Amino acid sequence: MQVGIVGGSGYIAGQLLRMLAFHKDIEIKIVSSKSHAGEKLSRVHPDLLNILDLRFSDMDPVDLASRVDLVFLALPHGTSINYVPDIYEIGTKIIDMSADFRLKDPDLYREWYGFEHNYPDLLEKFVYGMPEFHRNEIKNSRYVSVPGCIASSTIYSVAPFSMLNLDNNIVTVDAKVGSSGSGSGTDSSKNYSERYNSVRAYKPVHHRHTPEIEQEIKYISGKNIKIAMSAHSVNMVRGILTTSNIFIDLDEPDALSQLREFYKNEKFIRLIFDRKSNFRYPDPKTVIGTNFADLGVISDGYIKRIVSLGAIDNMIKGAAGNAIQSMNIMNHFDESEGLLIPAAFPV
């Protein structure tokens, strides 16, 4: 199958290229970047030297989409929406990496992303790209919207407990994110000198992944659970650790059993419970470069809560990995093709 990538110079596109290069069912045909047109991919993605001998194209996204079987849109939020309607008319399969088609309620885009969504009919066409919860829908769809990275880690952590009797139906989430989560732009706050030795509360309230987390948890549990999230940038390049406080009276063996049973058939979900290991709880260090989500849970009887931990690579399980897993399902490939890669350890 021939695929193309629009917005090929960003970090997420780089991870798509790294994994698709070794996918036995895929030919990468066109990769576009207006700012790097004509340059070799390896100039921007040096890890691809001697791996992919391609150059960036400046081809119009719709024209590009017409020449491939499936297109990945790796564009900033609010940009994909300008091209999807025309690509939809062509009939090319779409996997959108932005937030433009994640939310089912178009009014939420005004509140959380600052733009009007004028294509509510297309919102219904896109499936939320979490294979663990939408496998059958993805299998029968041509259009997938990949979840946000913090949203992914939070949903994986909270979902197994969301159908239980939570106190007040409120979950508090502390998210710690590496610098690559901000993308490859030139904002000075991303500079090494600004971020090094810093733990910055960059979004202590009103994080824009909140509505998609609440939307997905309602889909899974049928309940309106509120998410109170605070997000921090930390001194690492890639990875996310979410710590979710779920207020429920549940002892640790039962909490672990709930988590284990919920994900018992999921190859890319790993339960971390080894109190003698250096990594006794989920840690981003052990998932870097992989499509795994590492989950763990601890019970706190003192105030009747459980603490559910999730660690993912923000650029893989939080973006490119889930995109490729969804692509595999959509096209009836082996779901794990191109994705069973262990972490580089130590790093």
Curated annotation (Swiss-Prot):
It comes from the Archaea. Keywords: Amino-acid biosynthesis, Arginine biosynthesis, Cytoplasm, Lysine biosynthesis, NADP, Oxidoreductase. It catalyses: [amino-group carrier protein]-C-terminal-N-(1-carboxy-5-oxopentan-1-yl)-L-glutamine + phosphate + NADP(+) = [amino-group carrier protein]-C-terminal-N-(1-carboxy-5-phosphooxy-5-oxopentan-1-yl)-L-glutamine + NADPH + H(+); [amino-group carrier protein]-C-terminal-gamma-(L-glutamyl-5-semialdehyde)-L-glutamate + phosphate + NADP(+) = [amino-group carrier protein]-C-terminal-gamma-(5-phospho-L-glutamyl)-L-glutamate + NADPH + H(+). The keyword Metal-binding does not apply. The keyword Amino-acid biosynthesis applies. Its EC number is 1.2.1.103, 1.2.1.106. The active site is at C149. GO terms for cellular component: cytoplasm. GO terms for molecular function: N-acetyl-gamma-aminoadipyl-phosphate reductase activity; N-acetyl-gamma-glutamyl-phosphate reductase activity; NAD binding; NADP+ binding. InterPro entries: AGPR_type-1, LysY, NAD(P)-bd_dom_sf, NAGSA_dehydrogenase, Semialdehyde_DH_NAD-bd. Its main location: cytoplasm. Involved in both the arginine and lysine biosynthetic pathways. Belongs to the NAGSA dehydrogenase family. Type 1 subfamily. LysY sub-subfamily. This is Putative [LysW]-L-2-aminoadipate/[LysW]-L-glutamate phosphate reductase. The gene is lysY.
